UniProtKB/Swiss-Prot annotation:
Responsible for the deacetylation of lysine residues on the N-terminal part of the core histones (H2A, H2B, H3 and H4). Histone deacetylation gives a tag for epigenetic repression and plays an important role in transcriptional regulation, cell cycle progression and developmental events. Histone deacetylases act via the formation of large multiprotein complexes. Pfam families: Hist_deacetyl (PF00850). InterPro entries: HDAC_classIV, HDAC_PDAC, His_deacetylse, His_deacetylse_dom, His_deacetylse_dom_sf, Ureohydrolase_dom_sf. Belongs to the histone deacetylase family. It is found in: Nucleus. The gene is HDAC11. It comes from the Eukaryota. This is Histone deacetylase 11. One of its GO terms (cellular component) is nucleus.
Amino acid sequence: MLHTTQLYQHVPETRWPIVYSPRYNITFMGLEKLHPFDAGKWGKVINFLKEEKLLSDSMLVEAREASEEDLLVVHTRRYLNELKWSFAVATITEIPPVIFLPNFLVQRKVLRPLRTQTGGTIMAGKLAVERGWAINVGGGFHHCSSDRGGGFCAYADITLAIKFLFERVEGISRATIIDLDAHQGNGHERDFMDDKRVYIMDVYNRHIYPGDRFAKQAIRRKVELEWGTEDDEYLDKVERNIEKSLQEHLPDVVVYNAGTDILEGDRLGGLSISPAGIVKRDELVFRMVRGRHVPILMVTSGGYQKRTARIIADSILNLFGLGLIGPESPSISAQNSDTPLLPPAVP
């Protein structure tokens, strides 16, 4: 029997399927600055979109925190209990001083924001099926699996979003993960290792973290990149391999992990993609997936430079300008959903 969740509630038609909460952002006595990740980038993305008059608060969907019951759909209770130890959280987030904080503070200041982003991804999965597209301005914790975290990823939001859809939405039984973060997405790969319903395409720098050989067995379309890969080669490989992926496995939903750590100068990603290249990449993914009337859920994942927030905002503005997102009709695939379809908002 399915548990009761607060994450699958009706969303008014006046709100776009863009999910966010101010609680996404991690701020605690400057400790967040000890990790190269910009722990406030999610709020900056929203602020840029407001400045450009694309969005107002009344048009956003407020993310809810994933409950323990929600998390147990994927995670083991043992793993969730491990997160009650500050040492474990310090290891996962790669912020060593977290070891010395009382765990109640770690829960409130570090894990609650990550649980809220996780709830946002699950909510955005349902919205994507109803509306044809959705963006969680957060999430994409692709190094976390059911029983282990790492690389700033404490909860397996991608796995959770897909499993919620499989369990709760009629007609959703095949999914594709298009993971374009600079790092291998070993978390969801471990979770879906033997699940033929889920097709994983992963494009990543072959020389960097995590180098998880076991998890690579789950990748159906693997594209390994060399140091310093640039726009033309990258975009060509992305386009050709998405085309082949969608031919091999036409899904009922796509989860797009849109990491911006592919940006030139990112010392953890090691690739050399320009800001314009990232915007073009996102456009390619949306154009190819939406062109097949497949719902798409985008999460923002990694991106370790201060300018990534502006690039994410520019990409969303570009998608809107091209008509690839916006207050339009639901996707054709959504007609099979047992959740009531929301009528399109009036522009």
